[in-house]
Regions:
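Asparagine-centered polar/low-complexity signal
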Residues: 28-30, 62, 123
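Conserved short histidine dyad/triad with adjacent acidic residue
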Residues: 44-49, 62-78, 116
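Short hydrophobic/aromatic patches on the structural cores and recognition surfaces of FHA
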Residues: 90, 106, 121
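A short, N-terminal "cap"/entry segment at the start of jelly-roll beta-barrel domains
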Residues: 1-58, 145-180
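Ligand-binding loop in jelly-roll beta-barrel domains
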Residues: 113-140
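Short acidic-glycine-tyrosine-enriched beta hairpin
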Residues: 98-114
Length: 180
């Protein structure tokens, strides 16, 4: 997915110093450009991600809208990053730790890192489901996907991808493989 920045807040009638602070610190997700992601048959979302020009370096945010019957990502858990979801509109289902939990507008969902909390959000309703996805940005990061037996390792330095590797868990090598 391409990185899309949130537009800075509109700042009429502010002093130059206040205007500069607002431009640096405030973003409005209602004016953000959306990227449409589709991977049939299960995955589809409209998403705006706050990335390159965000003032905070240890937090990430996206606004996700998932159509009825779809989900935005596979069932997974993080080794380092924490996530929080704030349901803005609609209803759906949080699949977490093998359980299905109903979610509604106004719910705030906290997901710690670790294998105890594999998760994803499904839109099981007949209307769009819109939520904020907030995460810590801990690098490097490893995600595991229990349903598909995959592992993804990735890292960023100054918002540039320096490592991204996805492979099947059972396709590993011996530590000493190909070493002299």
């Amino acid at each position: 997915m391409e990185d899309i920045s949130f537009a800075p807040a509109v700042t009429p009638d502010l002093t130059p110093a206040a205007s500069a602070l607002a431009a640096r610190l405030i973003r409005n997700f209602n004016s953000a450009a959306l990227e449409h992601f589709v991977r049939p048959p299960l995955y589809e979302s409209l998403s705006a991600q706050l990335r390159p020009d965000r003032p905070g370096r240890k937090l990430g945010l996206s606004v996700d809208t998932v159509p009825p019957g779809k989900q935005s990502c596979p069932y997974h858990f993080h080794h380092a990053q924490e996530e929080m979801f704030v349901v803005l509109e609609g209803t759906g289902t949080l699949r977490v730790a093998g359980e299905l939990l109903p979610i509604v507008a106004g719910d705030v969902i906290f997901v710690p890192p670790g294998p105890e909390y594999p998760h994803h959000i499904l839109n099981t309703s007949s209307a769009p489901l819109k939520y904020l996805s907030i995460s810590t940005k801990e690098w490097p990061e490893v995600c595991e996907y229990p349903d598909s037996g995959k592992l993804m390792a990735f890292s960023f330095v100054q918002d540039e991808t320096t490592l991204r590797s996805v492979h099947k868990m059972d396709a590993g090598l011996d530590y000493w493989d190909s070493e002299a």
